[in-house]
């Protein structure tokens, strides 16, 4: 099902939840996608902890994402308000046509609903994102879920997908798998 966009006015008060800007309906559940708020920081942290193999950042980092980067991040909540999905990223300052996706997490009970794709697309369809023509991220070689998501996005948007080694194991302290830089694009906003 295609997400439906509701009228959305961001709240000037970051502590207040915003009205859902995207509603996803399915036979199983209704999920709401919106910008994160201060109150979401710890819930995002707990979600990411429950989604291996994702790197877990500090609770403070997720609070910063929920406030300082809220325009380029999104959370998905279920009807009870539990956070079941999260995407973080930013528009690159040195390449304003590129959105760098830092992390995407989908909780177990929301997997298989296409939520990861919908989170990414919800961010890219927001006002102010119209110049974005490329999507980048880094993915470890064995993260099948992330590779699958990016391949599906490239196919859906009819855009090329390229990858190359970005950070080696040595650059990551020898205790982390290498990260490949993965790039989709160019694509047109109407393809999203």
Curated annotation (Swiss-Prot):
Pathway membership: Amine and polyamine biosynthesis; ectoine biosynthesis; L-ectoine from L-aspartate 4-semialdehyde: step 2/3
Keywords per UniProt: Acyltransferase, Transferase
GO MF term set: diaminobutyrate acetyltransferase activity
Top EC group: transferase
Domain N-acetyltransferase: 31-192
Pfam families documented for this protein: Acetyltransf_1
GO biological process: ectoine biosynthetic process
Enzyme Commission number: 2.3.1.178
Database matches in InterPro entries: Acyl_CoA_acyltransferase, Ectoine_EctA, GNAT_dom
Family: Belongs to the acetyltransferase family. EctA subfamily.
Name recorded for this polypeptide: L-2,4-diaminobutyric acid acetyltransferase
Organism name: Chromohalobacter salexigens (strain ATCC BAA-138 / DSM 3043 / CIP 106854 / NCIMB 13768 / 1H11)
């Amino acid at each position: 099902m295609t997400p439906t966009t509701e009228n959305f006015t961001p709240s000037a008060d970051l502590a207040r939840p915003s009205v859902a800007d995207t509603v996803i309906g399915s036979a199983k559940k209704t999920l709401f996608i919106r910008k994160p708020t201060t109150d979401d920081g710890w819930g995002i942290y707990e979600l990411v902890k429950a989604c291996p193999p994702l790197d877990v950042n500090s609770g403070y980092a997720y609070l910063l994402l929920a406030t300082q980067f809220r325009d380029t991040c999104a959370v998905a909540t279920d009807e009870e308000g539990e956070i079941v999905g999260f995407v973080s990223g930013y528009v690159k300052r040195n390449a304003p046509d590129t959105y760098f996706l830092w992390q995407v997490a989908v909780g177990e009970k929301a997997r298989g609903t296409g939520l990861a794709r919908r989170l990414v697309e919800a961010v890219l369809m927001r006002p102010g994102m119209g110049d974005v023509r490329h999507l980048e991220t880094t993915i470890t070689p064995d993260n099948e879920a992330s590779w699958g998501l990016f391949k599906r996005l490239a196919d859906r948007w009819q855009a090329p997908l390229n990858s190359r080694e970005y950070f080696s194991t040595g650059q990551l302290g020898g205790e982390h798998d290498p990260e490949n830089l993965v790039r989709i694009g160019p694509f047109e906003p109407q393809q999203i």
